[in-house]
Amino acid sequence: MTTETPVEEMSFETAMQELERVVDQLERGDVALDASISLYERGAALKKRCEDELKRAEEKVAAITLDANGQPTGTQPLDAG
């Protein structure tokens, strides 16, 4: 088996691609039980990584401030709203 990249080191895109591969393998149903359990655990970690990255991106977008013309002028702390 190849060495797996730690989930916490993955970009959103890489984690999403691997999550799709894991789901495909599990849906095919041709994986041994022990391997299925490992895949499921890996998939759960990948899902959490993707959710965390999406939340972080949403927070950045929510913090963008606009001027009177609707142009971005910077960011503000999330709790300043």
From Swiss-Prot:
It comes from Ruegeria sp. (strain TM1040). This is Exodeoxyribonuclease 7 small subunit. The keyword Hydrolase applies. It holds the Pfam family Exonuc_VII_S. Keywords: Cytoplasm, Exonuclease, Hydrolase, Nuclease. Its main location: cytoplasm. One of its GO terms (molecular function) is exodeoxyribonuclease VII activity. HAMAP family: Exonuc_7_S. The keyword Nucleotidyltransferase does not apply. Belongs to the XseB family. InterPro entries: Exonuc_VII_S, Exonuc_VII_ssu_sf. GO terms for cellular component: cytosol; exodeoxyribonuclease VII complex. Bidirectionally degrades single-stranded DNA into large acid-insoluble oligonucleotides, which are then degraded further into small acid-soluble oligonucleotides. Its EC number is 3.1.11.6. Heterooligomer composed of large and small subunits.
